[in-house]
From Swiss-Prot:
Belongs to the UPF0161 family. Its main location: membrane. PANTHER family: MEMBRANE PROTEIN INSERTION EFFICIENCY FACTOR-RELATED. It is found in: Cell inner membrane. Transmembrane segments: none annotated. Could be involved in insertion of integral membrane proteins into the membrane. It comes from the Bacteria. This is Putative membrane protein insertion efficiency factor. NCBIfam families: membrane protein insertion efficiency factor YidD.
């Protein structure tokens, strides 16, 4: 998706040129990246837009994890353990309200032993 490439370009080349000034964690660009990875374009755009509007001296700041809605289905008792999984776990879904979750990215890399 073009939005993800633009955000990664901004994070890699433009963001290091200016001082860190975001009042929230995760930063606004990281928040936008997570939103565009997990929501459709319009929902991600509006969530990011309102987050950037809140990132100013009139708001307190702090932790503001993205919230996503997701339907989880009961899993089978026969599942692959994490070390046999084909994909690496990237996000944690922390329950917030009915079918709404905080999205938290796993920042530690798995080491092969």
């Amino acid at each position: 998706m073009i939005c993800l490439k633009i955000l990664r370009f901004y994070q890699k080349f433009l963001s290091p040129l200016k001082p860190a000034a975001c009042r929230y964690y995760p930063s606004c660009s990281e928040y936008a990246l997570w939103q565009f990875q997990k929501k459709n374009f319009f929902l991600a755009f509006f969530s990011t837009f309102f987050r950037i509007l809140r990132c100013n001296p009139f708001f307190k700041g702090g932790f503001d994890y993205p919230r996503v809605s997701k339907n989880f289905y009961p899993i089978n008792l026969c599942f692959k353990p994490i070390f046999l999984a084909e994909k690496q776990l990237c996000f944690l879904y922390i329950p917030y309200k009915n079918k709404s979750f905080y999205l938290i990215k796993i920042i530690f890399k798995r080491t092969n032993q």
